[in-house]
Curated annotation (Swiss-Prot):
One of its GO terms (molecular function) is phosphatase activity. ATP binds at residues 8, 11, 91, 141, 144. A single active site specifically recognizes both ATP and CTP and is responsible for their addition. Pfam families: HD, PolyA_pol, PolyA_pol_RNAbd. Residues 230-331 form the HD domain. Magnesium is required for nucleotidyltransferase activity. Nickel for phosphatase activity. This is Multifunctional CCA protein. Its EC number is 2.7.7.72, 3.1.3.-, 3.1.4.-.
Length: 413
């Protein structure tokens, strides 16, 4: 039995990045031998075990053979005679196909049959072999790695292979959960814009997220958007979200906030009247198709519908501010409202020349919410009940009190 550290841990060590998770491959062993040594089997599709002490993953060396279309169309073969070189050859990118005989201390020699260390030094994402084309998820992984390692470029031959896979319809067979998983990881990467640039370059964005692809080539008012192109604006917004270390729900909201601009009638351009409502409907279909988690979907819906009003909120009256808070469900879900405001700040600063600009709407609306929250609604409801009032009448009294509290706060500014 021989054990090697493989994949991301080796790659990140060569890049000088922190190593958070280590993966290991075991050559020359059977599942029975692994269990006999105390390893806990956890793999469903192929033999993976957890180390009895470290809980790190140890996978038996394996090969994969294409048996059908899409992500799940594979036959996996794992046996003691499968070599380390065979296991490395099934991997997607050369930078991920490096092993080391290192122990936990990190000492040891590299086993690098596909010259991944050379590609790391050259900052290139390159496929290991033409077997890359057997798994369409690898298109998403390359795009995600481009976002995680933004100083890397995709090798021309790899990009061409990705284009051919898209043209042959391989991305049409991806399962929604896997698309969302890779999309979410790309959104949370260092430079999310790179993911979408790579997906556009190979044609996959049009097949997977046509609502997003349609934003390119759509002009906006140069007065408000010096970058003009809506797609260019989207990339700036996504990278601003990464810069501000926004959570996933905010980054997805940034991705989806302007979808309605892709369907603006040509005779209306560069104005986009009503794009908020159109965008919310497109978002609904996109989120259902990809099975986006409920928290991401809800935050994105509010941002799509309300970002224009939030941008203009500095001029709103107390009554209008309270109505905005109610539409955003801010009093019931203040943390989600904070996420909505952060997404709007990313939108405002994700414009050419505005990256360092202040966004006073965010602290202003946060303070307005605090003023509205200072109203003791339960006390008002009890007083109203004592007067024989109920239902909408009680709600109206609470709203009046919140408007008064916000008005008092406005007067103090």
């Amino acid at each position: 039995m021989q054990i090697y550290m493989v994949g991301g841990a080796v790659r990140d060590r060569l890049l000088g990045r922190p190593v958070h998770d280590r993966d290991w491959v075991v050559v020359g062993a059977t599942p029975e031998q692994m269990r006999a040594q105390g390893y806990l089997p956890v793999g469903r599709d192929f033999p993976v075990f957890l180390h009895p002490a470290t809980r790190e993953e140890y996978a038996l060396a394996r090969t994969e053979r294409k048996s059908g279309r899409g992500y799940r169309g594979f036959v996996v073969h794992s046996a003691p005679e499968v070599t380390l070189q065979e296991d490395l050859s099934r991997r997607d990118l050369t930078i991920n196909a490096i092993a080391t005989s290192a122990d936990a201390s990190g000492a040891g020699c590299l086993i690098d049959p596909h010259h991944g260390a050379r590609d790391i030094a050259a900052r290139v994402l390159r496929h290991v072999s033409t077997a890359f084309r057997e798994d369409p998820v690898r298109i998403l992984r390359v795009a995600r790695f481009a976002a995680r390692l933004p100083d890397f470029t995709v090798a021309p031959e790899t990009l061409q292979l990705m284009r051919e896979m898209v043209a042959h319809g391989e991305t049409d067979h991806l399962v929604a959960e896997r698309v969302w998983q890779e999309l979410a990881r790309g959104l949370m990467a260092e430079k999310p814009s790179r993911m979408f640039e790579v997906l556009r370059a190979c044609g996959a964005l049009e097949r997977l997220l046509p609502e997003v692809e349609r934003l390119w080539g759509v002009p906006q008012s140069a007065e408000h958007h010096p970058e003009i192109d809506t797609g260019a604006h989207l990339l700036l917004v996504l990278d601003m979200a990464a810069r501000l270390q926004a959570p996933l729900a905010v980054r997805f909201a940034c991705l989806a906030h302007d979808l309605g601009k892709g369907s603006t009638p040509a005779d209306m351009l560069p104005r986009h009247i009503g794009h908020e409502t159109r965008g919310a409907e497109l978002l609904k279909h996109l989120a259902e198709r990809l099975r986006v988690p409920a928290d991401c979907r809800a935050t994105a819906d509010k941002v799509a519908r309300e970002h224009g009003h939030i941008h203009c909120s500095n001029a709103l009256s107390a009554a209008a501010l309270v109505r905005l808070l109610e539409r955003c469900d801010a009093l019931r879900l203040p943390q989600r409202f904070a996420d909505i405001l952060l997404a709007c700040e990313c939108d405002a600063r994700g414009r050419l020349g505005f990256a360092e600009s202040a966004y006073p709407q965010r602290p202003r609306l946060t303070a307005a919410l605090a003023a509205a929250q200072s109203v003791h609604s339960s006390a008002i409801a009890a007083q109203a009940a004592a007067r024989g009032l109920a239902g909408p009448q009680v709600g109206a009294l609470i709203r009046q009190a919140r408007v008064a509290a916000v008005a008092q706060w406005l007067a103090s500014q």
